[in-house]
């Protein structure tokens, strides 16, 4: 889809912004609202999760049974979930990633700017989820270019 010239120009333009490079190998555990061959979403939030090695099965089941199927309730257009395979050990706290996909930056910012008052049952659900994982970081990303 992109010419060699376009790819080279794009890479040169953004190369100066790179602070650190690396790679992650993920096992995709689940996704909702995403189909192979679909055009990629323009906006994504990557959530970096630390999960105790002894609670990984329970954590995966929680994500697959509650977070994934309910992705649209929080304004998300899609959701994904993966386990990091290429890094392991006590020096690597983050061992899972979740991906929230959005149609607009405004959707992300509105969700983040709202302060929710939880009901007792909602609070109990969130606290039970927090016993299984700890959100270490969250990054908003914008799709710059894609090729299918």
Each model region followed by its residue ranges:
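Short S/T/G/P-rich N-terminal loop/turn motif that feeds into the first structured element of a domain
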Residues: 1-148
């Amino acid at each position: 889809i992109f010419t060699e010239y376009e790819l080279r120009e794009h890479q040169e333009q953004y190369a100066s912004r790179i602070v650190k490079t690396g790679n992650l190998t993920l096992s995709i555990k689940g996704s909702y609202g995403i189909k192979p061959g679909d055009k990629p979403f323009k906006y994504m939030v990557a959530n970096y999760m630390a999960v105790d090695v002894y609670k990984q099965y329970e954590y995966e089941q929680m994500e697959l049974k509650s977070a994934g199927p309910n992705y649209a309730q929080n304004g998300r257009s899609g959701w994904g979930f993966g386990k990091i395979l290429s890094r392991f050990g006590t020096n690597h706290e983050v061992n899972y990633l979740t991906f929230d996909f959005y149609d607009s930056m405004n959707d992300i910012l509105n969700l983040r700017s709202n302060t929710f008052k939880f009901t007792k049952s909602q609070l109990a659900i969130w606290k039970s989820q927090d016993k299984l994982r700890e959100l270490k970081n969250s990054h908003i990303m914008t799709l710059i270019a894609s090729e299918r």
